Swiss-Prot record:
<dbReference type="InterPro" id="IPR013088">
    <property type="entry name" value="Znf_NHR/GATA"/>
</dbReference>
<feature type="region of interest" description="Interaction with HIPK3">
    <location>
        <begin position="564"/>
        <end position="654"/>
    </location>
</feature>
<dbReference type="GO" id="GO:2001237">
    <property type="term" value="P:negative regulation of extrinsic apoptotic signaling pathway"/>
</dbReference>
<feature type="region of interest" description="Disordered">
    <location>
        <begin position="204"/>
        <end position="236"/>
    </location>
</feature>
<feature type="compositionally biased region" description="Low complexity">
    <location>
        <begin position="204"/>
        <end position="213"/>
    </location>
</feature>
<comment type="function">
    <text>Steroid hormone receptors are ligand-activated transcription factors that regulate eukaryotic gene expression and affect cellular proliferation and differentiation in target tissues. Transcription factor activity is modulated by bound coactivator and corepressor proteins like ZBTB7A that recruits NCOR1 and NCOR2 to the androgen response elements/ARE on target genes, negatively regulating androgen receptor signaling and androgen-induced cell proliferation. Transcription activation is also down-regulated by NR0B2. Activated, but not phosphorylated, by HIPK3 and ZIPK/DAPK3.</text>
</comment>
<keyword id="KW-0963">Cytoplasm</keyword>
<dbReference type="Pfam" id="PF00104">
    <property type="entry name" value="Hormone_recep"/>
</dbReference>
<dbReference type="Pfam" id="PF00105">
    <property type="entry name" value="zf-C4"/>
</dbReference>
<feature type="modified residue" description="Phosphotyrosine; by CSK">
    <location>
        <position position="908"/>
    </location>
</feature>
<keyword id="KW-0564">Palmitate</keyword>
<feature type="modified residue" description="Phosphotyrosine; by CSK">
    <location>
        <position position="233"/>
    </location>
</feature>
<keyword id="KW-1017">Isopeptide bond</keyword>
<feature type="modified residue" description="Phosphotyrosine; by CSK and TNK2">
    <location>
        <position position="371"/>
    </location>
</feature>
<feature type="modified residue" description="Phosphoserine">
    <location>
        <position position="82"/>
    </location>
</feature>
<dbReference type="InterPro" id="IPR000536">
    <property type="entry name" value="Nucl_hrmn_rcpt_lig-bd"/>
</dbReference>
<dbReference type="GO" id="GO:0005737">
    <property type="term" value="C:cytoplasm"/>
</dbReference>
Length: 912
């Protein structure tokens, strides 16, 4: 049996009509103890409820309305023998409402033995409630009692016999000022809330007007505001003044009793502030925008048997961990402004718990619902199906919580996303929120790919009770039945703003790579994560692989063109003309090694002029260009039928290949674009082993491949090839180019006695045997010795290396095979002209050309053997612990088998 505790006594639960709050019970008990300090009658103590004495007082008030107040009776009858009480004093006791306080002799008449009022048996049988009487105007003696407290008599009879000290404390000016300030703040808060509601309703009305034909408009179903159960709790029919309500709230909160915290609100405000309690106070709740959040936060005010339900127990971990401190004002919910209408979701922009940013952008996307979330919103549906297509989506940032957030988020993140997907809300019979999820998904890629982004992939179709597997932060393929149309989902930029969740930078799953290779260090940008592909589906723009070469070879500034035989800027062009034609002698103040760049090119003219000569700038190249232009003009005047396009082509061709004497312009370009020295990063302090040597060679190969790409894209005419042909030529010829360049380095640095792969990786006889590729190393050393035997010049080496790039093609041909053949023929002619520059005898030129072409043919068998060796090593790399960089492994596994199978063959100058 539930009982009420008073001061010194235990009372049974009062009837429903006399059921009072904690505030009223407290002062009722205080009043009874003060007025009757003596022992009570046992029968009255056991049977009389706390409100019986109050009802007896009202009965006496109706019978003795004509009598004077108790204080005046005490003052006028001092000679009756009864002890006279002082009027004021620290220990004296007075009633709050003196007009309704019965006199002592009247109470003595009713029960002379015990001094207690009789039990209200007659009134309870007749059904008469507490009859309210209008208070009489107070006398002059009662002027100290404030008028506000005198109004509490009819409504709160329990306060009518409060002590003088308590009365004085409650009537202090500071307390009244505090109540007034609270009332003002409350009114200001209500005004701000009303303004926010009006603004949000206007935005929703604008969105509904612009929506597609009104088909996707938000239908708002009219429903009455829920009636709070606290009205019946306080008596229902009683009308409580504002001051009394505030006083009750202030005292109750100060005493830790939060039962009356929401009584001062209007019915509409009670819906907003108390919506978290509505579904559990009995009966099916009305349509409330905050109803789905009921199981997630708050406690139940009802003390009935429904307090310990499964729903409340299910979400108890989340209530204590996340929803602590939330009150009615912190919720992003408000009542609807429509008459009798249900409240719709209103999310202020200042709340961090709910989505607010994308709602401000809704004006640009009125036809859809945009809710920015990072994880799938999973959980049980609300008790009644919501008529609003976009209500109750709650947001949490997974980065703001600890490891326990994932379990809690699955319980409290759920919503009705019917407008985002064609259906698919979890059925009402689903179990825990973690086991069910909404099938509302959005596609990150195209509808054909069907790749989904999210923590779990749900099954489509919108069936009820379908269970899905939850995979946090996973990338899963869709199951059968889930199809994405282009117009069903918003663009990815709306779902994923800057900095929230990063997008997958690959157009398809086949392009995903596990790491970034060192070869991409010089290619940071939007295409930095891509690799070379064989098909056109994933081909990048040509400017990525082969951007134009526009850097001055002297100072590094932006080049304006080819001046005096070199690619230079306008400043270096003018400087070289004046310095070369002038008779002034320049002397460097330092050691002839000054730095010449864009900002310090004018500091040392001697070093700048020396660098111009090293780049190949000559005054004779200017004269040759003028002669070529004059010859073009004469040919243009002779033939009038030539089109302007053909004239431009002839002009470029003649200026490029006509009349070389000792320093052709073509060689200047080849010298300028020649790669520098690349190190392998090998640790020579460690003992040589097969795995260490081969791993260092693979790392060196990837680093050199970066320079090969940069060198090839700077070759004249190479960028005019088809983009597929460019990639194919590089992927097929990279091994021959590296072997040829390594042979030249071995010849120039160590006189072909060892293999000079890199400054930190030089192979001697011991390392050749240790690497298990001794036969290949011997052939490469023989190639290096050929450079010395044939006395190959640097100019011949540069031209032969460029020609070697165009010496291997697929058997089926390239995309633009005709242009490739023309470009290859031009480089062959350039090699022939370089040979003819230093040899006047035609027979000697032909013999030299034969020797150089035989040397080029000898590179192809060596490259083939190395292709076979690297392919076998890649297959056994896990067994022998040899590391292969990612790009090297890709090219060897994809392109090398084409060469070994005969689909790609080299082009030989001589019959093999």
């Amino acid at each position: 049996m539930e009982v009420q505790l008073g001061l010194g006594r235990v009372y049974p639960r009062p009837p429903s009509k006399t059921y009072r709050g904690a505030f009223q019970n407290l002062f009722q008990s205080v009043r009874e103890v003060i007025q009757n300090p003596g022992p009570r009658h046992p029968e009255a103590t056991s049977a009389a409820p706390p409100g019986a004495r109050l009802q007896q007082q009202h009965q006496h008030q109706q019978q003795h309305q004509h009598e004077t107040s108790p204080r005046r009776q005490q003052q006028q009858q001092p000679e009756d023998g009864s002890p006279q009480r002082p009027s004021r004093g620290p220990t004296s006791y007075l009633a709050l409402d003196e007009e309704q306080q019965p006199s002592q002799h009247q109470s003595a008449k009713g029960h002379p033995e015990s001094g207690c009022v009789p039990e209200p048996v007659a009134m309870s049988r007749t059904g008469k409630g507490l009859e309210q009487q209008q208070p009489a105007p107070p006398d002059e003696d009662d002027s100290a009692a404030p008028s506000t407290l005198s109004l509490l008599g009819p409504t709160f009879p329990g306060l009518s016999s409060c002590s003088t000290d308590l009365k004085d404390i409650l009537s202090e000016a500071g307390t009244m000022q505090l109540l007034q300030r609270q009332r003002q703040r409350q009114q200001q808060r209500q005004q701000q809330q009303q303004q926010q509601q009006q603004q949000q309703q206007q935005q929703q009305q604008q969105q509904e007007v612009v929506s597609e034909g009104g088909s996707s408009g938000r239908a708002r179903e009219a429903a009455g505001a829920p009636t709070s159960s606290k009205d019946s709790y306080l008596g229902g029919s009683s009308t409580i003044s504002d001051s009394a309500k505030e006083l009750c709230k202030a005292v109750s909160v100060s005493m830790g009793l939060g039962v009356e915290a929401l009584e001062h609100l209007s019915p509409g405000e009670q819906l907003r502030g108390d919506c978290m309690y509505a579904p559990l106070l009995g009966g099916p709740p009305p349509v409330c925008p905050c109803a789905p959040l009921t199981e997630c936060k708050g406690s139940v005010l009802d003390d009935g048997p429904s307090k310990g339900t499964e729903e409340t127990a299910e979400y108890s971990p989340f209530k204590t961990g996340y929803a602590k401190g939330l009150d009615g004002d912190s919720l992003g919910c408000s009542g609807s402004s429509q008459a009798g209408g249900s409240g719709t979701l209103e999310i202020p922009s200042t709340l961090s718990l709910y989505k607010s940013g994308t709602l401000d952008e809704a004006a640009a996307y009125q036809s859809r619902d945009y809710y920015n979330f990072q994880l799938s919103l999973a959980g049980p549906p609300p008790p009644p199906p919501s008529p609003h297509p976009h209500a109750r989506i709650k947001l949490e940032n997974p980065l703001d919580y600890g490891s326990a957030w994932a379990a809690a988020a699955a319980q409290c993140r759920y919503g009705d996303l019917a407008s985002l997907h064609g259906g698919g809300a979890a059925g009402p019979g689903s179990g825990s929120p973690s086991a069910t999820a909404s099938s509302s998904w959005h596609t990150l890629f195209t509808a054909e790919e069907g790749q989904l982004y999210g923590p779990c992939g749900g099954s489509g179709g919108g069936g009820t009770g379908e269970s899905v597997s939850v995979t946090p932060y996973g990338y899963t393929r869709p199951q059968q039945g889930l199809t994405g149309q282009e117009g069903d989902f918003p663009p990815p930029d709306v779902w994923y703003p800057g900095g929230v969740v990063s997008r997958m930078p690959y157009p398809s799953a086949s392009c995903v790579k596990s790491e970034m290779g060192p070869w991409m260090e010089s290619y940071s940008g939007p295409y930095g994560d891509m690799r070379l592909e064989t098909t056109r589906d994933h081909v990048l723009p040509i400017d990525y692989y082969f951007p134009p070469q526009k850097t001055c070879l002297i100072c590094g500034d932006e080049a304006s063109g080819c001046h005096y035989g070199a690619l230079t800027c306008g400043s270096c062009k003018v400087f070289f003309k004046r310095a070369a034609e002038g008779k002034q002698k320049y002397l460097c103040a330092s050691r002839n090694d000054c730095t010449i760049d864009k900002f310090r090119r004018k500091n040392c003219p001697p070093c700048r002029l020396r660098k111009c000569y090293e780049a190949g700038m000559t005054l004779g190249a200017r004269r040759l260009k003028k002669l070529g232009n004059l010859k073009l003009q004469e040919e243009g005047e002779a033939s009038s039928t030539t089109s302007p396009t053909e004239e431009t082509t002839q002009k470029l061709t003649v200026s490029h290949i006509e009349g070389y004497e000792c320093q052709p312009i073509f060689l200047n370009v080849l010298e300028a674009i020649e790669p520098g020295v690349v190190c392998a990063g090998h640790d020579n302090n460690q003992p040589d082993s097969f795995a260490a040597l081969l791993s260092s060679l693979n790392e060196l190969g990837e680093r050199q491949l970066v320079h090969v790409v940069k060198w090839a894209k700077a070759l004249p005419g190479f960028r005019n090839l088809h983009v597929d042909d460019q990639m194919a030529v590089i992927q097929y010829s990279w091994m021959g180019l590296m072997v040829f360049a390594m042979g030249w380095r071995s010849f120039t640095n160590v006189n072909s006695r060892m293999l000079y792969f890199a400054p930190d990786l030089v192979f001697n006889e011991y390392r050749m045997h240790k690497s298990r590729m001794y036969s290949q190393c011997v052939r490469m050393r023989h190639l290096s010795q050929e450079f010395g035997w044939l006395q190959i010049t640097p100019q011949e080496f540069l031209c032969m290396k460029a020609l070697l790039l165009f010496s291997i093609i697929p058997v089926d041909g390239l995309k633009n095979q005709k242009f490739f053949d023309e470009l290859r023929m031009n480089y062959i002619k350039d090699l022939d002209r370089i040979i003819a520059c230093k040899r006047k005898n035609p027979t000697s030129c032909s013999r030299r050309f034969y020797q150089l072409t035989k040397l080029l043919d000898s590179v192809q068998p060596i490259a083939r053997e190395l292709h076979q060796f690297t392919f076998d090593l890649l297959i056994k790399s896990h067994m022998v612990s040899v590391d292969f960089p990612e790009m090297m492994a890709e090219i060897i596994s994809v392109q090398v088998p084409k060469i070994l199978s005969g689909k790609v063959k080299p082009i030989y100058f001589h019959t093999q």
